């Protein structure tokens, strides 16, 4: 298989600004026809068990999975929040937005120089009964990491060029970013409890992205063989941080990693729940597809009980 060009790898990675631009320019999935300009999509179950507010980034919103709403936030009608609300009888307020960081929980999120989503925490009320928070990946620069590692893989596909780049000088830059994000997640959780004191709060972790039992599938997924273990460990550390902050701040952690092992980006169509560089089903690159969102919903529903 011919090697992908660096420019192609960069253009196809998970920078959600790029995904949003594609959606805006091409009208992907008829966003306008599905209520694209709303600030927070609301879906009501027939028999409401209360109000559920979903906060988070693109792993919550489900970019490019039909049907889309929420404008440039790229929310799917079958993301895990929507599925959980329907299954458990909640009225859903989906405030999630592709590209969100912890800062966007309390601040406007902007793109193209315009506000695309108000502060996600503004969706909370004193009557909110369920809150999920899926955040942190963009704080550590997930999109930039994938883009950087894809480019580095072309220089040494059988080595570990990305690991070397992020650990130069003996300091693991990604681990440091995870540690720096922990207090931000804690602050968000405290604010959730302040605004919705009666709500059950769940922190949703990130699913398995890279294979556990191999060194990857370069060049189909352009991560150098020697970098797969490092990036997998980085995700493990991110999830561990989220679990720790949930436990320390009155929330329940939802493990979506364990139940998705074996459904990573290197698996064949129908088995993989995370899409690779070139998606084979409607979803953003390196993000859950509809099967992945369904698996995350199942994990969340199991945690809720």
Each language-model region and where it sits:
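Secretory targeting and sorting signals
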Residues: 1-45
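Short amphipathic alpha-helices and their capping/turn segments at secondary-structure boundaries
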Residues: 40-51, 115-132, 185-200, 301-302
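Serine-esterase "nucleophile elbow" of acetyl-processing enzymes
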Residues: 45-99, 150-156
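Structural recognition of the beta-strand scaffold that forms the well-ordered cores
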Residues: 51-56, 60, 91-96, 129-134, ...
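Oxyanion-hole/transition-state-stabilizing segment in secreted/luminal serine hydrolases
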Residues: 63, 114-177, 208
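A structural motif corresponding to the C-terminal end of an alpha-helix
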Residues: 84-92, 183-200, 234-255
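Charged, often glycine-rich, active-site loop that binds/positions anionic groups
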Residues: 100-118, 264-280
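Catalytic His-Asp segment of secreted/periplasmic serine-dependent ester chemistry enzymes
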Residues: 207-305
């Amino acid at each position: 298989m011919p090697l992908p060009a660096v420019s192609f790898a960069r253009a196809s990675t998970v920078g959600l600004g790029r995904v949003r631009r594609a959606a805006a320019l091409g009208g992907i999935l008829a966003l306008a026809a599905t209520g694209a300009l709303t600030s927070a999509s609301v879906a009501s179950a027939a028999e409401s068990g209360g109000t559920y507010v979903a906060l988070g980034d693109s792993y919550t919103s489900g970019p490019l999975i039909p049907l889309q709403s929420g404008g440039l936030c790229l929310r799917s009608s079958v993301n895990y929040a929507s599925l959980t609300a329907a299954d458990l009888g909640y009225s859903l307020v989906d405030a999630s937005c592709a590209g969100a960081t912890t800062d966007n929980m309390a601040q406007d999120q902007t793109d193209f120089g315009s506000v695309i989503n108000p502060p996600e925490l503004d969706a909370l009320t004193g009557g909110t009964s369920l809150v999920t928070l899926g955040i942190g990946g963009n704080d550590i620069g997930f999109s930039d990491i994938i883009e950087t590692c894809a480019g580095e893989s072309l220089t040494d596909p059988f080595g570990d060029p990305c690991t070397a780049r992020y650990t130069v000088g003996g300091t693991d830059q990604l681990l440091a970013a995870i540690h720096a994000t922990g207090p931000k997640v804690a602050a968000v959780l405290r604010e959730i409890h302040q605004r919705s004191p009666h709500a059950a709060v769940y922190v949703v972790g990130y699913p398995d992205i890279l294979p556990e039992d191999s060194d990857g599938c370069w060049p189909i997924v352009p991560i150098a063989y020697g970098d797969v273990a490092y990036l997998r460990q980085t995700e493990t550390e991110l999830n561990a941080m989220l679990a720790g902050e949930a436990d320390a701040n009155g929330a329940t952690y939802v493990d979506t990693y364990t139940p998705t092992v074996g459904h990573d980006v290197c698996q064949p169509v129908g088995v993989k729940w995370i899409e690779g560089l070139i998606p084979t089903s409607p979803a953003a690159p390196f993000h859950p597809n509809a099967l992945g969102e369904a698996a995350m919903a199942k994990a969340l529903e199991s945690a809720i009980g």
